[in-house]
């Protein structure tokens, strides 16, 4: 049994070698000749999986170690009776913490308290739901927009995108990319609703590049529209607009979900799915794979102020560390993917044990994802 895995899937060799021969390969471009004798293919979001890649190949199972799967032609796989699995929610925590890191940058630069702002979340699935929960735990006003969930009658108060555009100080997008149908999210932000968006708003996209019409956004910024913009995803990738890159406040190379924990969850989820497929069920405890972080414990005193929160968040991950490298090399062919391939280890807040002398501080930190204790 031969299993082909993306070389950027941590722990894939360690896990899949128990099942057969494992070969790690680049995801873009994927060496198509390797598929001639491959039984299972494990990819990440940079690999387009469709008839062009797999027609006539012996592959019987495709797994993507990512939450989204718009890079996979699932309808074609189903027609060919090729089993498929994704990793829903695997990097949700990482994306939430990316958004918080960016918000702490703006809060410091502009001198605002997050609790004085209204955050509009578009797409309230694994990422958006977790983001809303953490923001609310801190006392931040949140407006939610999720038409599919609203239509299902889910037990939440949902608002229209137009309401969020008008009322939210911060807009962050966590919707899947749908290019057709009732819940079309292609160019959800476009020229017409950029006109509606008041000046001074913060716009964050860490979902899919095409959710925002990048040409329309660039045009608005060139015309003097005053917006603070964070883009982790681009239209197109990897050949993003250098002009737009130079206009946005924070720019990163599609790495919002790239924590070690998030990647490891993706690997373990598709590993477990493949084990089920071949009739050898397994369960992997993430803690058995992850190393101890470089900074594992810190002590804090007093109440949880925004200043303290910002220090803790940026101790674990400061989004600006990923902005500068992209700006340096974005115009060089292949460098966007290299930044992703050789991405430095990044951990989640839960990897940091925070020892607090204030029980309320410990409780709040635990509520938003830190590993806090009161002593």
Curated annotation (Swiss-Prot):
It catalyses: 4-phospho-D-erythronate + NAD(+) = (R)-3-hydroxy-2-oxo-4-phosphooxybutanoate + NADH + H(+). NAD(+) binds at residues 146, 175, 206-208, 232, 257. NCBIfam families: PRK00257.1. GO terms for cellular component: cytosol. Substrate binds at residues 45, 66, 258. It holds the Pfam family DUF3410. Coiled coil: none annotated. InterPro entries: D-isomer_2_OHA_DH_cat_dom, D-isomer_DH_CS, D-isomer_DH_CS1, D-isomer_DH_NAD-bd, Erythronate-4-P_DHase, Erythronate-4-P_DHase_dimer, NAD(P)-bd_dom_sf, PdxB_dimer_sf. Catalyzes the oxidation of erythronate-4-phosphate to 3-hydroxy-2-oxo-4-phosphonooxybutanoate. The active site is at 208, 237, 254 (proton donor). Its EC number is 1.1.1.290. This is Erythronate-4-phosphate dehydrogenase. Its main location: cytoplasm. The keyword NAD applies. PANTHER family: FORMATE DEHYDROGENASE 1 (PTHR42938:SF9). HAMAP family: PdxB. It is an enzyme of class 1 (oxidoreductase). Belongs to the D-isomer specific 2-hydroxyacid dehydrogenase family. PdxB subfamily. GO terms for biological process: 'de novo' pyridoxal 5'-phosphate biosynthetic process; pyridoxine biosynthetic process. SUPFAM superfamilies: Formate/glycerate dehydrogenase catalytic domain-like (SSF52283), NAD(P)-binding Rossmann-fold domains (SSF51735). Keywords: Cytoplasm, NAD, Oxidoreductase, Pyridoxine biosynthesis. Homodimer. Pathway: Cofactor biosynthesis; pyridoxine 5'-phosphate biosynthesis; pyridoxine 5'-phosphate from D-erythrose 4-phosphate: step 2/5. One of its GO terms (molecular function) is NAD binding. The gene is pdxB. It is found in: Cytoplasm.
């Amino acid at each position: 049994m031969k299993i082909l895995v993306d070389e950027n899937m941590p722990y894939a060799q360690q896990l899949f070698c128990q099942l057969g021969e494992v070969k790690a390969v680049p995801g873009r471009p994927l060496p198509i000749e390797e598929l001639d004798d491959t039984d299972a293919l494990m990819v990440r979001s940079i690999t387009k999986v469709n008839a062009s890649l797999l027609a006539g190949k012996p592959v019987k199972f495709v797994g993507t170690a990512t939450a989204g799967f718009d890079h996979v032609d699932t309808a074609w796989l189903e027609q060919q009776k090729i089993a498929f699995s994704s990793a829903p929610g695997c990097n949700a925590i990482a994306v939430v913490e990316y958004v918080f890191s960016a918000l702490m940058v703006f809060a410091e630069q502009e001198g605002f308290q997050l609790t004085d702002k209204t955050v509009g979340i578009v797409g309230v699935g694994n990422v958006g739901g977790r983001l809303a929960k953490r923001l609310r735990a801190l006392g931040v006003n949140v407006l939610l927009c999720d038409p599919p969930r609203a239509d299902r009658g889910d037990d939440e108060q949902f608002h229209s995108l137009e309401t969020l555009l008008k009322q939210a100080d911060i807009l962050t997008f966590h919707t899947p990319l749908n290019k057709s149908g009732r819940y079309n999210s292609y160019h959800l932000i476009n020229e017409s609703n950029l006109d509606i968006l008041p000046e001074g708003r913060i716009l964050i996209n860490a979902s899919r590049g095409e959710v925002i019409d990048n040409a329309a956004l660039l045009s608005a910024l060139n015309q003097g529209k005053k917006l603070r913009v964070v883009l982790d995803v681009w239209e197109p990738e990897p050949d993003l607009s250098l002009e737009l890159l130079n206009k946005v406040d924070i720019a990163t190379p599609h790495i919002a979900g790239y924590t070690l924990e998030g990647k490891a969850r993706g690997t373990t989820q598709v590993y477990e799915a493949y084990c089920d497929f071949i009739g050898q069920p397994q369960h992997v405890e993430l803690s058995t794979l992850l190393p101890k972080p470089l900074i594992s414990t810190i002590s804090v005193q007093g109440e949880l102020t925004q200043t303290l929160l910002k220090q803790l968040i940026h101790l674990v991950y400061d989004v600006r560390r990923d902005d500068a490298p992209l700006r340096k090399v974005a115009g060089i062919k292949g460098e966007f993917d290299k930044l992703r391939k050789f991405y430095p280890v990044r951990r989640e807040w839960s990897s940091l044990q925070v020892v607090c002398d204030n029980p309320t501080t410990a409780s709040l930190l635990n509520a938003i994802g830190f590993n806090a204790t009161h002593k």
